[in-house]
Amino acid sequence: MSITKAYAAQGATTPLTPFNFERREPGAHDVQIEILYCGVCHSDIHQARGEWGNSIFPMVPGHEIFAVGDLAGVGCFVDSCRECHNCKEGLEQYCDTGMVGTYNGVEKDGTPTYGGYSTQIVVDEKYTLRVSDKLPLTGVAPLLCAGITTYSPLKHVGVKKGDRVAVLGLGGLGHMAVKFAVAFGAEVTMLSSSPSKKADAERLGAHHFALTSDEATMKGLQNHFDVILNTVSAQHDYITYLNLLRTNGTMIVVGVPPAPVQIHAFPLIMQRRSIIGSLIGGIKETQEMLDFCAEHNIVSDVEVIKMDYINEAYERILKSDVRYRFVIDLASLK
């Protein structure tokens, strides 16, 4: 076994601190990867602070992993049952027995998984991804979560040229959603509660910007969109945005508010609208997304930080003070 340097949360109320542990020896189908960059996802904060009720401590977060060597990536999971219908269909994220998370998971031998806030990782080759050398290195890691989280549902609902797509919320997920929807040929509108986001939305490629607090603007957008990709994790009123959908329109939910949301039946029934959720993507689709990004030169907008800045980064994420994703340079941990 090899000693790995990392940062870990020892409990839900403690900051992340240096932590050493042993990675398993590579098996016949494993690859040992030296981690170059790891993205910081908002879900890392939820898990490290025990907010979802399933945290395993000590915890080494990080599921947006980009490595040196053959330019390899590791995303949100490192194993699944491989036998159920979903796994066989390339939907490992919906594995009937549960995917094995890159961190805060349990391997088949009962050992906990530790993530990418570390210098290296050992992963089954079936759960690694190829990354093109055409892409700027620092912006790749967030594609493995924020990227696939937005790419997958847009592909699932068949977004195409000429569709009217709204992206609700301009953050780590929202900025990737704009890039993908534009690349698919859609007419894209950014819906935001912050006037300061207009310039960034336009820079990212959005064709329109709508301030959600402007009643006249929102009224004018009723029955307008084919798809709304809802990336907002703060508590908000879904019904307001359902009314912006055309007949047969779909709201895709990828943000997770802290409390249950209220849905009335009439906005759905009267225009045959629908709401769906979506969780990351399978290995095949994630590879497809990475190849698409290489073809269209799509990466995440990032701020690169050192490992010892992680606790400050968490606080800044909670204040929406990052444009639009933190990425840890793991060279700072060696």
For the regions a protein language model found, what residue spans apply to each?
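C-terminal hydrophobic helical "lid"/dimerization subdomain
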Residues: 1-4, 239, 283-334
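Glycine-rich beta-strand-centered segment in the early N-terminal region that forms part
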Residues: 22-38, 49-88, 92-93, 114, ...
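Short glycine-centered segments of the SAM/dcSAM-binding site in methyltransferase folds
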Residues: 71, 164, 249-250, 274
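NAD(P)H dinucleotide-binding glycine-rich loop of Rossmann-like/cofactor-binding domains
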Residues: 81-168
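Adenosine-nucleotide cofactor-binding segment
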Residues: 161-170, 180-240
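N-terminal Rossmann-fold NAD(P) dinucleotide-binding loop
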Residues: 174-175
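Helix-to-beta-strand junctions that scaffold the AdoMet/dcAdoMet cofactor pocket
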Residues: 245-246
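Rossmann-fold dehydrogenase core element
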Residues: 250-252, 263-303
